[in-house]
Amino acid sequence: MCIRDSPEAVGKVSGWGWSLGYVGGLITLGLCLAVVTTGQSQGLGMDSLVAATNIITAAVFLVVSLPVFMWLKERAVPQVHGIAQLKTAMAQDVDKGKTAEILMKFVDFRYLVVCGFFYQCGVATVITLAAVYASAVMGFGLTETLVMVLLVNITAAVGAFGFGYIQDRIGHKLALALTLLLWIAMVATAASAQTSAVFWVAANLAGLAMGSSQSAGRALVAVFAPEKKLARFYGIWNMALWLSAVIGPITYGAVTWMTGNNQRLAIVAVSYAHLRAHETLA
């Protein structure tokens, strides 16, 4: 919709999307924490409280989906034989290797996918293991860790929102390159942090880098994709990101294990992925 109607605002729209997503996550987290805290004060067990948080999360999904179901207008023309055409298209993709064909034909998009895979390894590791690192390396307690998670989400929302406007002004590639430098600075700060104050700086940088890089990457996909192939391009992009969500944390864990539980070296290893991403983008 944005590509067709307002191509000059792709970054802004992407930034709004990611920023509001983080805000929604904060609201959901706040509701869950309130339920858990209240339940514990009344002597309820954690099993029932955890189940309640799942129900809350599902309810939030339902509520925020209602505007889409009720008011968003479908612009695509309905196809009489839509299901049959979908099955045919899927069979052709499998038989002809359309994904490989797209990556070979659209060189810039191929480099972006590789770049996204590398930097998302770092994003996935931060999301998955930030609390573990804070507890094991920096000695954070439960309260400090919860505050850190909230802070990272807030700065991620700010980063996504702000960089959305910035990338429309300076260009999507340059904006993404700047976010990767921000990631490298974050890792260097976190790995060298000896005090809580320095680690809080790293946490803020992580949030800014996380929101801005996700916003910039998605906008750049929209720039490279032909209008009639947007869904397919985003499918390839998301496939690379989900793969990196597995590889990143596994790499962190493997380095931690091989170095005798040295998580500082493990997080430095994650920075190598950001360097490779920056190199690929260049």
List the model feature ranges, each with a label.
Residues 159-171:
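Helix-to-loop junctions at the C-terminal end of transmembrane segments
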Residues 128-144:
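Short amphipathic helix-loop junctions that connect adjacent transmembrane helices
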Residues 174-188:
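Structural signature of the two symmetry-related core transmembrane helices
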Residues 36-58, 254-272:
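A membrane-interface helix-boundary motif in multi-pass transporters
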Residues 75-113:
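Juxtamembrane intracellular "pre-TM" segments in multi-pass secondary transporters
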Residues 191-202:
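Helix-loop junctions at membrane interfaces in 12-TM secondary transporters
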Residues 4, 213-225:
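Intracellular juxtamembrane helix-capping segments at the cytosolic ends
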Residues 1-5, 273-280:
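Conserved small/polar residues in nucleotide/adenosyl-binding loops
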